[in-house]
Amino acid sequence: MRKCIACLLCLFFVVPVFSQTASTISEILEKDAASYLDFSYLIVAEAGMDSTPFEAYTWCERFGTFPLGDTPDSPITAKTVSHFLMKNYELGGGLMWSATQSPRYAWKEMKANGFWRKSFDPDRQLSGRETVQAVSKFFDENPDIVLREPPTAAASHDNRALLLQDKEEE
């Protein structure tokens, strides 16, 4: 009897969490141009954390690999995805990647390793479907990979104010 009650309780608490993730991912898949928010949400969801897309972006922004002029709603490019994955999952690469750690050489490394198609432009804005496929492919090819700790302990000042405002409204 206790096992049945425990199973029912788990069902009531676990299913809504997965349905929220599934609905968010479905929304991402339908987009013509995925944003930093979408990419960040996929990374954080893969890490097993539960968050909103903006909370995920704020967490990923702490790594310092997103371009400074871009906003959370800016379309994400293949070059930016490559740079985030190579730098923050501490993947090794060739001489130019090791020397510069630049987004362009991150993209070149991943393209040379077969991650991106040969005809893929580094500045191509990824659709939601392409972003989900890229993140899934990355974790399928690297099942034991671990994200490094963010070098910044807190969210940027602008994002911190927005997060606190959001919490006050709840």
Language-model segments: which ranges?
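Short, linear, compositionally biased motifs with a strong N-terminal bias
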Residues: 10-11
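Positively charged n-region of N-terminal signal peptides that target proteins for export
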Residues: 1-4
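Cleavable N-terminal signal peptides
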Residues: 6-7, 17
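Terminal recognition/anchoring or ligand-binding modules at protein termini
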Residues: 19-52, 66-170
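Membrane-interface interhelical connector segments
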Residues: 56-63
